[in-house]
Amino acid sequence: MPQMKLFGNSRSAARVAGRRKAEPENEPKEKKQKKKKPLKVLAIWLTVILCLEGLYFFLCYTQNSFVKRWRTIYIQTAMSTMRHQWMATYLLPEPVIDEVLQMRIQAAEAVGDKESSWSKEPETTTPAEPVEPAIKPIDTTVTEMETETMTPEDEQALAKEAFYEMFWELDQATMEAYVEQNPSVLDNGWENININEAGLDDNGTSIMTTMGEQVLAINAKEEIMLVRVEGSGYRGILAIAKDPARLNVENSSGVGQFGQLTGTIAQAHNGILATTCSGFIDIDSQGNWGNGNGGLIAGYAMSNGHGYGTHYVSNPNFQYYRLEIHTDNLIYIKKVDKEVSEDCRDATEFQPPIIIDGEVLQNDYWVELNPRVCIGQSDKYEMLLLVIEGRLYTEGILGTDVNECAKILQRHNAVKAMNVDGGTSAMMWYDGEYVIRGSNSATRYTGSRPVPNAFVYHKVEE
């Protein structure tokens, strides 16, 4: 019986056996190669660390204009807060931080003792008493006929003309289109138009300004308009209050002891609009910073002729200024070491001033990105109240710098403007609701933090 060949022949069997014997000899070599891997990993990590260290030194010390600008923004944004200065001091070398702060000091010194003034008498902000005309031999019958021939259409034409004269910023084509789509807005005539789509759940109107801004609200009777302002990394609202005589600083009911929400202050003083005004000493009874109740005014303020608080003392890091509203209903800006004017009726202190007598005090060192509140006055004597949202990081809304605020206000012909307390306190309330989101997630939709006072634009007295 023939035998079965398992390996073909003896040579092939020998080769297979040889390979099997050779395999164990290769195993020690493989083990030696594995011992070399930790060295490679270590080398990779060292390379990564060296690259990161090189990047760190590049970001800290390079004079590249793009990197330097954002480094300055980062440092100033962190150092302008109470709670987050560690983001600069812990991560960046002290000399780098000091250099940025020194440049800020130089920028403040450049403003110097500039003090605002008005070069001409303002137009009267309230209707003058009618002047009795000289008696002339005229046909009174004809005069009566002219009055009687004024039709309702003629009256509305005059009211429409007055409306567009007051709200000169409006793009008339978009306003007319809105009225055509929403004819009910004219139910009470042009003089009583009241459009409000400024709420946090609203999307605004289709009306635009000639500056390209979306209109959120118009109230002809109250002489006020709200427009959306937005740009790279920020959004907010500019309120244009046409009658400066109706804007005052109003206090919380517990000023000196506790603050109130902006809207609460407005409602207590018959206001239709309110924004943040003075800063406050943000410390609680246990001495914990960042937990104040908003009652203690930081700096000096005046409300309806009565002064409160203690004047700021300027230092090299912060040059403080006072914004005064005088009895002529005009804004004046001066350094805090100047005497309060005798005819001042309302005031607040903060920094920096951003427009004095039409000159924009723009520079490269007031560039921190924060929620903002600014107040200004146009060459038509309108009060301009600007609030910018910020620190909404998931939406890419960081806030903006005072230079951008100056550009927004300048579009509306501001000749005076100053930055006031913003940050987590930045808020605007209009006609019964908050129209700005706060930067604190816990109070984002409910009015943010209690404050000692607010700029309040009062309703027309019936």
Model-found features: residue ranges?
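Gly/Ser/Thr/Pro-rich low-complexity, intrinsically disordered segments
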Residues: 2-462
